[in-house]
Amino acid sequence: DLFERHGAPVEEKHFPGKESQSMEQALDEIVKKLELGEEQFETAAVVLRTENEAKKAAHILKEKLQAAGFDTENRFSYLHRDSASFCKGLTVTTFYLAKGLEFDQVFSLFPKADRSTLSRQGRYIAATRALHKLHMYEYGK
C-alpha cells in the first residue's frame, strides 16, 4: 500500500476486454455504486487519466444517469481546464485537475495497460481525493 486509509475498504476491480467496451462496463458499475443523495454523500468524482477519456466518460455517464432519473442539470459537472466552477453532486475530471480537491466518494478509472510513471502518479492523486469511499477501477487488456 502506498499510504494508510481510514474508512470503508477500497474496492479494486478490473473490467477486461476492448477499451471502449470495458470502459462502458466500468461506467455502468459507477452508476450502480454511486452514493449521492439526502441520506448519502454530497460529492463524488470519477477521476480519469486524460481530458479525452474524461470527456468521453462524462458524455456516457450523463446519458446513463439521465436515464436513471438522476438530476444531471444541477448535480453533474464535467470539470475541464476551462471550467470556472463545478457543483455538488458528481464531478467527472482528470487526475491533474482533481489535485487539491476532495470528494466523499471517488471512482478512479484508468486503462490497465498504462503502467507509466505518470499513470501511477495519476492513480495516487485519484486515490488521495477520497474522504470516505474509494473505488479503484481499471479497464481494457
Region locations from a protein language model:
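Inter-lobe coupling/hinge region of RecA-like P-loop helicase motors
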Residues: D1-E29, L36-L48, L90
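Core RecA-like ATPase module of SF1/SF2 helicases and allied nucleic-acid translocases
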Residues: F3, E35-K141
